Every structure is written in C-alpha cells, then in structure tokens.
Curated annotation (Swiss-Prot):
Annotated compartments: Nucleus; Cytoplasm
Pfam families on file: CSN8_PSD8_EIF3K
Described purpose of this protein according to its UniProt entry: Component of the eukaryotic translation initiation factor 3 (eIF-3) complex, which is involved in protein synthesis of a specialized repertoire of mRNAs and, together with other initiation factors, stimulates binding of mRNA and methionyl-tRNAi to the 40S ribosome. The eIF-3 complex specifically targets and initiates translation of a subset of mRNAs involved in cell proliferation.
PCI domain mapped to chain residues: 42-204
Descriptive protein name: Eukaryotic translation initiation factor 3 subunit K
Length: 218
C-alpha cells in the first residue's frame, strides 16, 4: 500500500482538479480515509470531499467510511471539524448506527461531559476499532479544556476526566503539560490570572485629523 505522504499528494492533486466531485474517485478517497484511521493521520479537506460526494450521489453512501470521518474529526477538537462533517450528513443517516452513537459521543465531548463520554465509549468500544490514537487524541482535547478552566483540580477528578487513568498514566499526562502536584490531593494546573492579559488600546489622533471637525462646529 502506498505511504500516507504519497496518498496525500495524489489526493491533493485530485481535489485541485476538475474531477474533485467525480464519483469515480470515491474508491480512492475512501481508501485514503481508512489510511488516515490506521496511521493516525488527518486530512479534513479530503474527508469533506467524500461527504460532499455522498450528498451528490446518495446511492454510494458508506456508513463505515462516514463513521471513520466523524471519529477522525473528533480527534481534532476543539476545532469545528466535527460540526462541519455532521452538517453534511442527512438526518436519515444520522439516525443510523453507528453514526447516531458517534454523534452522541461528540455531543458529550463538546459539552465537556467527559466522565459520561468515557462511560458511553466503554459501552461502544467497537466504534473505534481501527482508529489509531483515538483515545489519546481525546485526552489532549480534555487537557486543553482543563488547562484553560482550572487553576487547581482534584487528582481523582482529573483521572476520571481522562478516562479513569492509573497513577502512572496520570503522571505521564501531568508531565506532558507541566502540571505539578499540590497539597491535599490536588494538582496545580496554572495561574489563570497570569493568562489574563488586558489589552491597552491607545489611539493616536493628530491635530490635522480633528481640525476640520473643530472648524465646522464653530
């Protein structure tokens, strides 16, 4: 099988050409989606092109490929990729399994119900078969949310939010983000006050720019 970089280059040429929405290219684009899933890579433009082709050619719709596209979009939170992809799927297909379950998982993540997300995922682990790095990508998003929300967080709560991590696993993520152990079972995330940088706006107005206004007011 061609390497991902080679496939990306080939697909990039295809998407720039007049055949961007030629249904004969669907097989190539669908293989590319599968390769992204296996190699923990991502190409939003190509994935949106697949969904657009499904819109134009409903008979060619593939539930499995669409599910992979949605799951890959979730790995790129907090960007809006998931919403973009969801809006290109008609309501009837959104009600199908596994798409319905994936949309539910996405809603839990976007509303920061992280413990509920891991519980729902645990009940549907088959959804992420073949999606390399999915869980760690989600953990990166959760750490992003924690980093902009908390100054201190309970150790047990952080472990739960990251999917009931063991102590060694939790330490790996703490080290990755530079979070320090604090007292009373808490973790120091950051000083949010230091992150608030007020912007001073200084507007310089020279005399020439107001002299006309002054003259007209006399």
């Amino acid at each position: 099988m061609a390497s991902f970089d080679q496939m990306r280059a080939n697909v990039g040429k295809l998407l720039r050409g007049i055949d961007r929405y030629n249904p004969e290219n669907l097989a190539t684009l669908e293989r590319y989606v599968e390769t992204q899933a296996k190699e923990n890579a991502y190409d939003l433009e190509a994935n949106l092109a697949v969904l657009k082709l499904y819109q134009f050619n409903p008979a060619f719709f593939q539930t499995t490929v669409t599910a992979q596209i949605l799951l890959k979009a979730l790995t790129n939170l907090p960007h809006t990729d998931f919403t973009l992809c969801k809006c290109m799927i008609d309501q009837a297909h959104q009600e199908e399994r596994p798409i319905r379950q994936i949309l539910y998982l996405g809603d839990l993540l976007e509303t920061c119900h992280f413990q509920s997300f891991w519980q729902a995922l645990d009940e549907n682990l088959d959804l992420i078969d073949g999606i390399t790095g999915f869980e760690d990508s989600v953990r990166k998003f959760i750490c992003h949310v924690v980093g902009i929300t908390y100054q201190h967080i309970d150790r047990w709560l952080l472990a739960e939010m990251l999917g009931d991590l063991s102590e060694p696993q939790l330490r790996v993520w703490m080290s990755k983000y530079g979070w320090m152990e604090s007292e009373n079972g808490k973790i120091f995330v950051c000083n949010q006050e230091e992150n608030i940088k007020p912007k001073n706006i200084v507007e310089k107005i020279d005399f020439d720019s107001v002299s006309g206004i002054m003259a007209s007011s006399q």
